[in-house]
């Protein structure tokens, strides 16, 4: 493990297109990094660590980079708090954002939230999964914070369901509330301590194309309002009422740079780069892969359709976006037919 001297590295490649770890260097864009096999060999010889080129990692990195630029998700000197569960999505996101420390001069902070899921704590500090998370943060030279909350998200959602008329709240809802409460509070504290506008501190989530298309289809199947994830969302201050107490949600900005990326490409990129991720969903009894939820069925339906229509997930998201755009311009549904 070594600390990379950027001045020396620049002799061989453009570090704006490399993900730099202490134990390896990943190539985000071979052409833009100006890398040849000879230069890769020289880097390995001088720094004593492997240079890994993965076509999938390059593809994902390029696509995420274009998505960030198109939607202006990240600005120079932003502070980006990555919600790091250690799973495939958030871990790959952390690696992809590493280059923006050099490109845009951003500051990266990785934060893991230790939530209580009916007595199960997948992100407790002494677990093997969290040790793996800490290892990756150390290799990327990114500060890591663990935020703990003892409230049981299963009990919280039972309270909401009991006091709601005809609505059922899953533990996933209260889990997301706890995470946003803690991450939003941290973002506010950082903005105040740094004396910068809250817009300069952003929360980064690893939601991908599968997540977005599954969500859209599940909402349709449940007869709910059409909801989907956006590249950048501004949230106003809000409170979730749990009867005997309220959980405040601070004003914040959430970014989702991984929205155009398929889950299978995320897994393939990590595998090709030799990056082990925490299978945190195996620890949670309410994850998509367990049970018989509508969301799981929607995932399976789209997975099956992908065999015949490879871009079906992009089409689902595109249709939702076009529908919202249409009705925002035509509130009474006029059509020019």
Curated annotation (Swiss-Prot):
Gene3D superfamilies: HUPs. Its cofactor is [4Fe-4S] cluster; Mg(2+). Keywords: 4Fe-4S, ATP-binding, Iron, Iron-sulfur, Metal-binding, Nucleotide-binding, Transferase. GO terms for molecular function: 4 iron, 4 sulfur cluster binding; ATP binding; metal ion binding; transferase activity; tRNA binding. ATP binds at residues 83, 179, 206. SUPFAM superfamilies: Adenine nucleotide alpha hydrolases-like (SSF52402). CDD domains: TtcA-like. [4Fe-4S] cluster binds at residues 172, 175, 284. Binds 1 [4Fe-4S] cluster per subunit. The cluster is chelated by three Cys residues. One of its GO terms (biological process) is tRNA wobble position uridine thiolation. Its EC number is 2.8.1.-. GO terms for cellular component: cytosolic tRNA wobble base thiouridylase complex. It is an enzyme of class 2 (transferase). Pfam families: ATP_bind_3. The keyword Thylakoid does not apply. Belongs to the TtcA family. This is Probable sulfurtransferase. The lineage of its organism: Archaea, Methanobacteriati, Methanobacteriota, Methanomada group, Methanococci.
């Amino acid at each position: 493990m070594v600390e990379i001297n950027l001045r020396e590295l620049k002799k061989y490649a453009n570090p704006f297109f490399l993900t730099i770890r202490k134990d390896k260097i990943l190539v985000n864009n071979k052409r833009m990094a100006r890398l040849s096999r000879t230069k890769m060999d020289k880097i390995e010889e001088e720094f004593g660590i492997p240079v890994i080129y993965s076509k999938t990692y390059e593809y994902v990195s390029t696509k995420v980079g274009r998505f960030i630029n198109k939607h202006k998700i990240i600005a120079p000197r932003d502070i980006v708090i990555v919600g790091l569960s250690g799973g495939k999505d958030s871990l790959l996101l952390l690696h992809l954002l590493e280059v923006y420390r050099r490109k845009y001069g951003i500051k990266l902070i990785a934060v893991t939230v230790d939530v209580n899921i009916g007595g199960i704590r997948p992100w407790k500090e002494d677990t093997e999964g969290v040790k793996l998370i800490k290892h990756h943060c150390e290799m990327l030279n990114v500060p890591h914070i663990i935020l703990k909350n003892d409230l049981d998200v299963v009990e919280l959602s039972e309270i909401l369901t009991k006091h709601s008329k005809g609505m059922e709240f899953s533990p996933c809802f209260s889990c997301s509330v706890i995470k946003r409460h803690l991450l939003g509070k941290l973002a506010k504290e950082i903005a105040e301590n740094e004396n910068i506008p809250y817009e300069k501190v952003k929360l980064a989530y690893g939601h991908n194309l599968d997540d977005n298309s599954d969500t859209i289809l599940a909402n349709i199947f449940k007869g709910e309002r059409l909801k989907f994830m956006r590249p950048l969302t501004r949230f106003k201050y809000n409170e979730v009422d749990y009867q005997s107490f309220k959980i405040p949600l601070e004003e914040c900005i959430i970014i989702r740079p991984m929205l155009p990326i398929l889950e299978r490409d995320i897994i393939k990129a990590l595998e090709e780069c030799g990056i082990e991720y925490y299978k945190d969903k195996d620890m949670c009894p309410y994850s998509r892969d367990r049970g018989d939820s509508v969301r799981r069925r929607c995932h399976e339906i789209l997975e099956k359709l992908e065999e015949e229509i490879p871009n079906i997930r992009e089409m689902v998201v595109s249709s939702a976006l076009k529908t919202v755009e249409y009705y925002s311009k035509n509130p009474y549904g006029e059509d020019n037919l």
